[in-house]
């Protein structure tokens, strides 16, 4: 039975969250908003919310099938997702396979350079601070996780990377990097939360050699390349098995 949204809880950059009739379940509405540079750049793109909801649902189900616990419970309709309520750890967990984005600004690595092994970075989730990169010492100082939780986060993040990288490879998409969020449910279990979509993953089309055309993620919006919704639609089409 389709649940009706209860009280409004939170309005984020791309999603709005509501209570349900159960205390440990929430409804997430995926919006058409596109943002970049900590929301300094903003636009509404018709159809984006529907695509991100469907892509995220498919990828959450893939992870669940492979034994990775997520907050996903089901899809209510094209833009609404039912999820477990979690206490989100205020960390952006970024896994990188290919040098791109901030990594190229902070190191001598060239854009597109394959990393010798996946790199895991933690960023403090705070727009006012600019989501700063955290060292192990700073993570310990802030006390955002226990050492045991951090090891579990690392294990889950690398497992997710292997699953997604292999899956995307089969549909001619290169997983450059991606961002995860995780949180604890009422039973204290660590779950992958938020969303997994072209808003949070860099995906390059291996069917194209053109450095701009191959971009099928939010970098199209960041770099004013256009065709954002069309690129997201191409990803969903391939995920659903339509070459």
From Swiss-Prot:
Pathway this chain belongs to: Purine metabolism; IMP biosynthesis via de novo pathway; 5-amino-1-(5-phospho-D-ribosyl)imidazole-4-carboxamide from 5-amino-1-(5-phospho-D-ribosyl)imidazole-4-carboxylate: step 1/2
EC identifiers of the protein: 6.3.2.6
Catalysed conversion reaction: 5-amino-1-(5-phospho-D-ribosyl)imidazole-4-carboxylate + L-aspartate + ATP = (2S)-2-[5-amino-1-(5-phospho-beta-D-ribosyl)imidazole-4-carboxamido]succinate + ADP + phosphate + 2 H(+)
Gene Ontology biological process terms in this record: 'de novo' IMP biosynthetic process; cobalamin biosynthetic process
Keyword Ligase applies: yes
InterPro entries membership: SAICAR_synt/ADE2_N, SAICAR_synt_PurC, SAICAR_synth, SAICAR_synthetase
Pfam families: SAICAR_synt (PF01259)
Top-level enzyme category: ligase
Sorted UniProt keywords: ATP-binding, Ligase, Nucleotide-binding, Purine biosynthesis
GO molecular function: ATP binding; phosphoribosylaminoimidazolesuccinocarboxamide synthase activity
Leader sequence residues: none
Family affiliation: Belongs to the SAICAR synthetase family.
NCBIfam families, alphabetized: purC
Protein name: Phosphoribosylaminoimidazole-succinocarboxamide synthase
Species annotation: Prochlorococcus marinus (strain MIT 9211)
């Amino acid at each position: 039975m389709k649940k009706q949204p209860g009280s409004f809880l939170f309005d984020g950059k791309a999603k709005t969250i509501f209570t349900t009739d159960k205390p440990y379940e929430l409804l997430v509405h995926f919006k058409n908003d596109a943002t970049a540079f900590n929301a300094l750049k903003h636009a509404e793109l018709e159809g984006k919310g529907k695509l991100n909801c469907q892509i995220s649902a498919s990828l959450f189900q893939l992870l669940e099938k492979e034994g990775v616990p997520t907050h996903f419970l089901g899809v209510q309709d094209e833009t609404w997702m039912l999820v477990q309520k979690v206490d989100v750890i205020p960390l952006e967990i970024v896994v990188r396979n290919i040098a791109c984005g901030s990594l190229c600004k902070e190191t001598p690595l060239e854009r597109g350079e394959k990393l010798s092994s996946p790199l895991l970075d933690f960023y403090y989730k705070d727009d006012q601070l600019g989501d700063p990169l955290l060292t192990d010492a700073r993570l310990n100082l802030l006390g955002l996780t226990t050492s045991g939780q951090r090891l579990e986060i690392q294990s889950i993040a690398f497992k997710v990377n292997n699953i997604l990288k292999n899956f995307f490879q089969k549909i001619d998409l290169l997983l450059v990097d991606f961002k995860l969020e995780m949180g604890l449910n009422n039973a204290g279990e660590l779950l992958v939360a938020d969303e997994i979509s072209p808003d949070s993953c860099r995906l390059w089309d291996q069917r194209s050699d053109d450095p701009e055309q191959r971009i099928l993620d939010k970098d199209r919006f960041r770099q004013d390349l256009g065709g954002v919704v069309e690129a997201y639609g191409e990803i969903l089409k391939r995920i659903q098995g339509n070459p």
